[in-house]
């Protein structure tokens, strides 16, 4: 029987703010467990998460000042507007090591792929990133996080590949599930055979019908 991976995927459609309450609950729990929490997204989404954290009782200025909470819309991982896989992974690896050296249990990170990739929608680069990110999760056991895929802003092929590249799916703050469509790292490819099944699962995730994943 498999176990829930530390490298999870959230696929959604509609307003991104719908998932902020669930992410806030996860962040609160990770902070209680002495993890540093990193949230990467656009300036409006960072502001929105900050408001939801305040409403949930999190002392955001205090947590940010301490370095326990990092809310960032910095896009230095983009090179001339283009997603730089090496730069992004080096930044993430350094953040994990820094968190450990500063006494944290680990680093929990989440980012929206639409923001992380900028205007570029490069499928081969996405596959390279997710494959190497999965390797990083295996190398750094104190790293955990959620890759967010917004169906409304990403090409269908990228959303399908995002689904296939994650062993576990984030449903909400109390539920994650094993992914029946997970493709092992050594089998990563741009070609997917089960398009209809993938689309059915994506529809179920976006509509909140997680029971269909059994």
Set out the residue ranges of the language-model regions.
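Non-catalytic regulatory/interaction regions at protein termini and inter-domain linkers
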Residues: 1-213
């Amino acid at each position: 029987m498999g176990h829930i991976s530390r490298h999870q995927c959230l696929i959604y459609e509609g307003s991104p703010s719908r998932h902020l309450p669930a992410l806030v609950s996860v962040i609160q729990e990770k902070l209680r467990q002495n993890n540093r929490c990193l949230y990467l997204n656009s300036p409006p989404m960072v502001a929105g998460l900050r408001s939801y954290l305040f409403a949930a009782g999190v002392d955001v200025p205090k947590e940010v000042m301490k370095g326990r909470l990092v809310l960032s819309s910095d896009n230095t991982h983009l090179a001339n507007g283009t997603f730089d896989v090496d730069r992004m992974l080096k930044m993430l690896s350094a953040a994990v090591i820094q968190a450990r050296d500063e006494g944290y249990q680990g680093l929990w990170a989440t980012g929206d792929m639409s923001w992380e990739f900028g205007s570029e929608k490069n499928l081969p680069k996405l596959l390279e990133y997710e494959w190497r990110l999965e390797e990083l999760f295996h190398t750094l056991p104190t790293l955990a996080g959620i890759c967010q895929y917004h169906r409304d802003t990403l090409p269908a092929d990228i959303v399908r590949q995002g689904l296939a590249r994650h062993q576990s799916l984030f449903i909400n703050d109390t539920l994650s599930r094993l992914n029946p469509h997970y493709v092992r790292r050594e089998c990563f490819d741009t070609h997917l055979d089960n398009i209809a099944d993938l689309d059915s699962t994506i529809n179920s995730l976006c509509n909140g019908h997680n029971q269909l994943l059994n």
